[in-house]
Amino acid sequence: MPELPEVENVRRTLENLVTGKTIEDVIVTYPKIVKRPDDAKIFKEMLKGETIENIKRRGKFLLLYVTNYVIVSHLRMEGKFLLHQEDEPIDKHTHVRFLFTDGTELHYKDVRKFGTMHLFKKGEEMNQMPLADLGPEPFDAELTPQYLQERLQKTNRKIKVVLLDQRLLVGLGNIYVDEVLFRSQIHPEREASSLTAEEIERIYEATVTTLGEAVKRGGSTIRTYINSQGQIGSFQELLNVYGKKGEPCVTCGTILEKTVVGGRGTHYCPICQPRI
C-alpha cells in the first residue's frame, strides 16, 4: 500500500501533469470506487467543466482541487494515476478516466479495485470522513515528542499497532513503521504505555527522518508502485528490516526475524530491538 512518501511523490508528479486542465467528461467503469456521491453518474456530471487547480495530500489521501469541488482519493493497495493521450490503448485495470479538453486523459488504474474516491464541495472535505479524524502530519509543528507521549502513555496497545493508527499521526504504514521502530531500537510488540520519554523521542526523530528521506528518494517500490510519471522509487534500497527476514542485521549481524503484530507481517532485529 502506498504510504506517505509514495503518495507525496504521486502528488508532486501528478500536479505537474494535470494542473490547469479542464475536465470535459468522466468515464467510470467500476462505480464502486466512487463512494461519494453514491451514484457515479452524479460524480461524473458534477465534474464536467471543472478545472484542476492544485493537488494536495492529507496523510495517505490525494486531494484534487477543481473549480468548485475536491476529489479525495485513496490509492489503497495498487491504485495509480497516469496521464495518457486519447488515442492510447486503455488498460483493462483502468476504472476511472478523466477526459480533458486538450485531448489528454487521466486514468485511475487499480488491479485490486480497493481504491476510493469521495467528492466534496470545497471547504467541506476536512470536516467529513474519511479526513475528519486524521492525526497530525509528520512534518507539522503539531507533531512533537510531547504530543506522542501524552497519547502513548494512555494505551496498552502494541506500539506497532498504535503507529499504524492514522488517528495518532498520518502517513505511516507497514513498511515505514518497521523501519522507524528499527531505527528507534524499539520492539514492535512493546506496549505503548511502557515506553520512556527518551524512547518516544527516538520514535519521533526516526519518523520524521525516515519519511523525509523516503520522500526525497521517491518512495519505496516493493512490488508495483510508480509515481504519475511512471517512475519507481529507490528508498527500498535503504530499507534495514522490512522484507529482510533471514538476512543479517545491518547493525549487529543477527539474523532478522518476522512475526505478526496486529495482523501485519512485522520485521525486526531481536538484539537491536529487545522485547523488554
Swiss-Prot record:
Cofactor: Zn(2+)
Reaction(s) catalysed by this chain's protein: Hydrolysis of DNA containing ring-opened 7-methylguanine residues, releasing 2,6-diamino-4-hydroxy-5-(N-methyl)formamidopyrimidine; 2'-deoxyribonucleotide-(2'-deoxyribose 5'-phosphate)-2'-deoxyribonucleotide-DNA = a 3'-end 2'-deoxyribonucleotide-(2,3-dehydro-2,3-deoxyribose 5'-phosphate)-DNA + a 5'-end 5'-phospho-2'-deoxyribonucleoside-DNA + H(+)
Key word Transferase present: no
EC assignment: 3.2.2.23, 4.2.99.18
Active site (catalytic residues): 2 (schiff-base intermediate with dna), 3 (proton donor), 60 (proton donor), 264 (proton donor)
Xref: Gene3D superfamilies: 1.10.8.50, MutM-like, N-terminal
GO molecular-function terms, A-Z: 8-oxo-7,8-dihydroguanine DNA N-glycosylase activity; class I DNA-(apurinic or apyrimidinic site) endonuclease activity; damaged DNA binding; zinc ion binding
UniProt entry tagged with the keyword Hydrolase: yes
Binding site for DNA: 93, 112
Cystine crosslinks: none
BP term (GO), one: base-excision repair
Subunit structure, as described in the record: Monomer.
Function: Involved in base excision repair of DNA damaged by oxidation or by mutagenic agents. Acts as a DNA glycosylase that recognizes and removes damaged bases. Has a preference for oxidized purines, such as 7,8-dihydro-8-oxoguanine (8-oxoG). Has AP (apurinic/apyrimidinic) lyase activity and introduces nicks in the DNA strand. Cleaves the DNA backbone by beta-delta elimination to generate a single-strand break at the site of the removed base with both 3'- and 5'-phosphates.
Annotated protein name in UniProt: Formamidopyrimidine-DNA glycosylase
Organism, scientific name: Bacillus cereus (strain ATCC 10987 / NRS 248)
Gene transcribed to yield this protein: mutM
